Amino acid sequence: MKQVTVLDKTRATTVATEVAVADTFLRRLIGLLGRRRLDAEAGLWIRPSSGVHTFGMLFAIDVVALDRHHRIYAVWPGLRPWRISGVSWKIHSVLELPTGTIQQKGIEIGDQLEFLPSAFT
């Protein structure tokens, strides 16, 4: 699976360095199902996606919703299993991160993210 590094250009910080890209129907369908946790610096970028659910998941995640220009449209910190994030036609992709990442990295609505190919993908 392709991997990217995610930067917050607004804050000049690195959000995560090991983010898998779910850009096919099957990869989007499977998502994080079957995993017991997300490691620090890991994540899943689901594109296209107008929102996510955590049905069948075993752990909470931070969810960052992005518009088509990779600007943060909404955040859902600590989305627990068996929940649904907000859904909007303005959301183009969704970034799933370990719980606590939004707070630790100071991620806020309106921030501009950049996705760079990881060195070893």
Name each region found by the language model.
Residues M1-T121:
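Compact, glycine-rich, soluble single-domain proteins
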